[in-house]
Amino acid sequence: MTGDLARMSEMPGPDAFLRAVPLTSGIAGFAAPPAPIGVVYAIAGSSSRVLLDRASIGALCDDPDSVVAAAGQVGSQVKMRVGTTWLVANVRSLKLEDNAGTCIAAEIDFLGEGDEEPLTGNLDRFRRGVTRYPMPGCEVFPITTADLQQVYAAEDRANITIGTVYPTTDIPAALYVDPMLGKHFALVGSTGTGKSTAAALILHRICELAPQGHVVMIDPHGEYAAAFASNGALYDVSNLQMPYWLMNFEEHCEVFLTSSGSARQFDADILAKCLLAAKAKSRLGQEIAKLTVDAPVPYLLSDLTTIINAEMGKMDRAGDTAPYLRLKTKIDEIKADPRYGFMFSGMLVADTMASFLARIFRLPGDGKPISIIDVSGVPSDITAVVVAVLARMTFDFAIWSRNEPQRPILLVCEEAHRYIPAGQEATSAVGRILGRIAKEGRKYGVSLGLITQRPSDLAEGVLS
């Protein structure tokens, strides 16, 4: 019994495990954890600074783990231990800190945190956000492939895989679809960096995940037709057949008015009066008790020019007819120009809004949930109006059907800076409607995707 008591007194106390050497250091098959490569120098909520030892980083270049070997590079990640938690941060910039060249200062942005796995010391159960920041002087470590797998692990939520996480070859790069579309998204980059390829891949994956979804892509250069030949409906000037009467009054003004300054307002008043009279002559217009100039009511362009002529005949002085002549001349030019036939053909007056929306929004989808609207053949002076009508129809359709089962729609605009340039988003119809979708679209199930090579030229309010 005395021997048993003696042996019991030799058993480790509760603190012995804390003082013990990590189990992995004595078990074959477990790699020793990487040594620290620097220390935390300054901490701030938005951006922090660490000092990296150049020699320590150089010693990792030949590490068999490609993630560890890339430690310290711009775009790589580092980690810091706070209690039993690992904090993970992105390296944003680097510069030499001393004349000897032994110390590198790095600006970092925190990604999130995860628990420290007791056996291996690796990162576990990563989550976005930081609850406790490290103190200056805290050691900085390189992350490993196992850590990176935790950072980019896809949870049990709808996601699409678009590639692998660099510098690994086996960690899938996944995007959560609902957060991406619910908050809108933008693809930005200089010419030749692969924006169009990335956009095509993302849209393909979304269509595979949700084949009954609805995607409308505005394609200004005819780049996407080949990419979606099998699962997309392709529309260009030969088959778009967008009825001109779908335009609201603001869009009519952008197409028909050629004047500026005070004369433009006078011309707009004349157009409003004549346009309302032309819509009132149609059968549908006669059935509407309170017809407005914005109502999408079919009307004949010939009726509009006839009414303009009649109003012009009431003028006493020849000089007073100039605004009417400007309007009539512009309308006649558009009617006679075959380039505008996709929108201003007299045959389109018989179309209905329901049939046009069903075609563009793929209702039903018939295995082709995406519509590619190729506007490369559209005359440049009305391209913005065509995009404005499509965007407004998308938003209005979502509002009109909000009491029905929701049909989420994704509207993607390539070369977005052409339609919503910085400082001018409030002066054009397309700028206003895309801005409204960016601010309010998610309430009604409309998502907006913007692709641009000039983010600085894009309206700041929309991009934010």
Can you describe what each PLM-predicted range is?
Residues 185, 373, 449:
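Conserved beta-strand position immediately N-terminal to the Walker
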Residues 258, 429, 436-440, 444-464:
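Conserved ATP-driven motor cores of ASCE-family P-loop NTPases powering translocation/secretion/packaging/pilus
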Residues 159-242, 458-460:
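Glycine-rich phosphate-binding loop of nucleotide-binding enzymes
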Residues 178-180, 206-211, 363-365, 400-405, ...:
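Conserved catalytic network of the ASCE P-loop NTPase/AAA+ motor domain
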Residues 222-228, 232-233, 244-436:
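P-loop NTPase motor domains
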Residues 212-215, 367-370, 406-410, 443-449:
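Loop/turn-to-beta-strand initiation segments
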Residues 1-188, 404-407, 422:
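Basic- and hydrophobic-enriched, low-structure N-terminal and domain-boundary segments
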